[in-house]
Each structure stands twice: as C-alpha cells, then as structure tokens.
Amino acid sequence: MSETGSNEIKQWTLEPETEYRFELDPGTSLAIKLIQGNAEVFGAELAEGKHYLFGSECKAAVFTWQGCTIEMRHPSTEYVSEETPMAAYANLHIAFEQMRVRALAKFHGSPLPPGDEPPTAPEPPRVLVLGPENSGKTTVCKILTNYAVRAGQNWSPLLVNVDPSEGAWSAPGALSIAPVHGPIPTYSPANPLGSAATSAPMAMSSNALLPVVYWYGHPDTKRNPLLMDRLIRNLGENVNDRFELDQEGRSSGVIVDTPSSFASSSTSNDHRQKLIKACMDAFRINVILVVGHEKLNVEMQRAYSSYVTVVKIPKSGGVVELDHSYRERVHNYQLHTYMYGQVIQAPPGISNATLGGESLTDLVLSPSSSVIKFEDLSIFRIGAETMAPSSALPIGATRVVSEMQPVPVDPSQPGSGLLNAVLALLAPQNPDENERYDEEILDLTVSGFLIVTNLGMQQRKMTILAPNQGSVVGKTAIMGSFEWQEQ
C-alpha cells in the first residue's frame, strides 16, 4: 500500500487472486480507480482509469485474477485478503458454461464432441442458491450471473429473487425476476442486483433491467408462507412462458437467490421445506448450491440428490455480519432510491465518478406528489394485519380471514395503518368479467410503488408520492408492513 499526496488518497497493489475488501460507514462514500491490471467487483469488470463510486454503507470487494493497482479516496474499513473462494466460483461457472453449450447444441441439433455427451438429455443450469444469514448468497448469484454474461456467448440468464427482505430491483417486500444481458454493477446495497429501467428517468442506463415483480409486502417469509408459495409459483410460470417464446434463450439458464429463512432452523421446518420444494418445482431446478452450511448440505443431499446435483461451496471470509438495524437502514435506502434515484456524493476532487459505470445525473429522480380522493384507489391487505400461525389456533377452529384473502382497507377508518405505508400498484385486472376470480389480485404483477404521505379525514383525500405523474384513479393497490421514513 502507498499514499499519494493527500492522506485521503491511497494506492493498493494487489497480487494475483487476492481482493481488496471495504466496508463503508453511514454517510460516507468511496471512489476507486483501476490504475493498471485487471480487476472486478463481484464478477463485473472495472475499466482502467475510470472512478467508481460506492456509498450507502456498501460492503464489497475488488478481486483480481492477474494482479492490479487500484487507487481510492475516502476509504473506511479496508484490508486485503489472500484467501478467497473465487477459484471455486470460477469452477462452478465453467461447469455451468458447459451445460449451456450442450443445451444450445441440442436446440440447434448440433453434435457434441466425442466423449462430451452427458448421460441424460442436456439441460441448461437451473440453479437454486441456499445458505444461512450472512453467507453471501446474493454475491454468489451476482458473480455467476456476471461471469455468464461476460462469456462472449450472448447468454442472458434469468436472475430470480425470492428474498422479500432484499427487494432486488424494486422495493423491499417484492419477489422478482429479470433477464440479465450485461454485467450487474455493485455500488450500493439499495441496488443489490443492479438498477431497473423504471428508475432511470432522463437517460436509459446501459445495464438497466426490466423485471417482473410480485408483491409479498413483508421482510419475513414466516409472515405468510402460503402467499410466498403462490408468488414463487407465479414467478415460475413467468419463467416457463418466457422459455416457450425463446427456446434458444432457454439455454442461458436460471439462477435463484433465496432468503436465509430457507436455511434457518428457527423457521418452521414444514413451511421451510414447502417453500424450497416450491422453488424446485417452479423453476425446475437441477443444481442446488449450499453456501457454507454443512447441516443444510446434508439435508438437501438426502432430499434431492437422487434427481438434482447438490454442491456445497465455501463462504467468503469477507462476508460481513449484518445486524437488524443495518437491514432496516438498507430498506430505507431502497425506498428512497426507488423514489429519488441513487444520490451518493463523490469525494472532493472527483468530478467524473460513476455508479456502476453510469453517470451520476442519469440516476437521479424527481418524484411526483399528488392528492387523490379516498375512493379513487382500491386498497387491499392480504390476510389479517396480525395473524397467529395455524398451529396456534384452538383445535377445530378456523380463521375468520384466510391468509390468502384480500381484505379491503378503508382509509377513513382509524387504525387503517395507511399513513406512510408503502403501496404496490398492480397491473390492470382481466377485462373479461367471466375470467375474474376472488383472489385475482394475488396473481397480478406490480406496475409501481406509492407512498401515502398524508391522510385528510375531513376532506376524504390522501396525498401520495409516486415516481411519475401518472393517474392512479380506478386502480388497485396492496399494502404490506413496510413504511416510509424520511431521511
């Protein structure tokens, strides 16, 4: 390590297959520039001579295969590690690349080289990533996805997020899926899997994604496992529909990021197993990756190894233990980023910094505040606001409100919980009345998110914050348990 000029500017020379790890404090930012060599952040390459900006308590690492020199301004907690799991992750990528090539050859009817024929019909990788809290599952998904799109074969794998506490490309509480055509950048925990095109206003971000989003509305899968199961299967139907229309694109495969509750012994084992099975069925999984958890690996081997490949992979030593307060701050960052865009102040002396390679001005938004009548928007809550587990009900008792029942929310009623609530605005319902059904809104995708910032009881009006000025009159929205907090 060397210092150049100011104490705020440092240079690190990294040896091959080492990584520079950093953790940012609240309110700080870090600018990194690749001086020479090659480097990547979770599989996304850095361009030489360009400043990359990180903020919002980002925790990440710059890895190099062949060695490099990097310069940074305003570092926080930082160190270099010679022990990384990247060789194991690269081997996984090579194995998945072979599966993609075989699947594509099968689609085109091309013969495989002698000795390369698999014992069964070649299938693309459909990967389920499991692991406990703070194991680095999302990072593994990001690295494998980035290596696929960098392979030069025009792969566009589908990246699926079924972790409602993460939010992925939209807001916390969402489950979503998106085809990935370019490397996913890392610059803020508010955008853990990159930026959606819907949050790029003035200039389309070159790596913007177009996700399909469903609304679960809570950070914890235990809150409503039946709804989780249904939404996972809805995502699976979207995957299958896409592959029916794009048989060649099917060869790119699917990578599924999961919540830590899928590996948690504190979660009801019955619910946990059902949700894992829902993912297995919905996405037709053929590979399970277990990140650093021996007991879970044995459990998956016993349950699924007869028809899928189960692989235990190492957890990175750079994974940071995240507490509950940090996760709540990240949820707040995500909601503000959805409404106002990504706003990170560059360190002094830097005027050309980028967020994941994109200009800072391209990622700033101006949301719209508008006043609507209570009756202009139909608002529902799925199930009762508080609901005991079925096992806690008296013997023979049944619920008055089922876990899957849409319950209308009246803004004029005290205790509605609407003030500062996050609402998921749904896509239009089926115009054919004969095709309607009671729980249809559970199967509708999300077209955007709203925040209720004020309730006027006497005027029977409410103020909503939205990313744009589009009308919401006559539309339907669902509320969950997330709330807006001013920064």
From Swiss-Prot:
It holds the Pfam family CLP1_P. Keywords: ATP-binding, mRNA processing, Nucleotide-binding, Nucleus. ATP binds at residues 19, 59, 134-139. One of its GO terms (cellular component) is mRNA cleavage factor complex. InterPro entries: Clp1, Clp1/Grc3, Clp1_C, Clp1_C_sf, Clp1_N, Clp1_N_sf, CLP1_P, P-loop_NTPase. Gene3D superfamilies: Clp1, DNA binding domain (2.60.120.1030), P-loop containing nucleotide triphosphate hydrolases (3.40.50.300), Pre-mRNA cleavage complex subunit Clp1, C-terminal domain (2.40.30.330). One of its GO terms (molecular function) is ATP binding. It is found in: Nucleus. SUPFAM superfamilies: P-loop containing nucleoside triphosphate hydrolases. One of its GO terms (biological process) is tRNA splicing, via endonucleolytic cleavage and ligation. Its main location: nucleus. It comes from the Eukaryota. Component of a pre-mRNA cleavage factor complex. Interacts directly with PCF11. HAMAP family: Clp1. Belongs to the Clp1 family. Clp1 subfamily. Required for endonucleolytic cleavage during polyadenylation-dependent pre-mRNA 3'-end formation. This is mRNA cleavage and polyadenylation factor CLP1. It comes from Laccaria bicolor (strain S238N-H82 / ATCC MYA-4686) (Bicoloured deceiver). The gene is CLP1.
